[in-house]
Amino acid sequence: MNPAFAWDELALLWNANNFGAVHDWLGERWNTLIQTRSKGQEDPDAQFLQGLAFAALSFHFTQNHNQDGAALLAEDALAMLPRFLPVYCGLEIAPVLETLNTLLPQLVWLEHDADCPMQPFVFNKLVYQVMN
């Protein structure tokens, strides 16, 4: 992973519940990786960023009345992120998975455009380690 990625920037967005901006931040870096790495979308770092982006978009969707999209992306994130446990590139994965595992069962019986089942939306903060 590029050490120039400023996880502190991502944590500020994540911890402020600004998941739309988190998705954009991750998407920009994912796009760069798939264009510059020989494995493209199969690159492990790219897959890691994609899994985080799926989680962020799920959290964004559930708060913006798109429960079907939130469930789909939560499932995608849960399929991708466990392989990066416990820590990948300095980011702790378990807190993200815990929020996804709490949210997903609550989405199952909701109407597509229902309110977020968690009022207020409670999520684990992004935890990262400073890499030297």
Residue ranges and their predicted role:
Residues 51, 61, 70-80:
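Alpha-helical protein-protein interaction scaffolds
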Residues 107-132:
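A hydrophobic membrane-anchoring alpha-helix module
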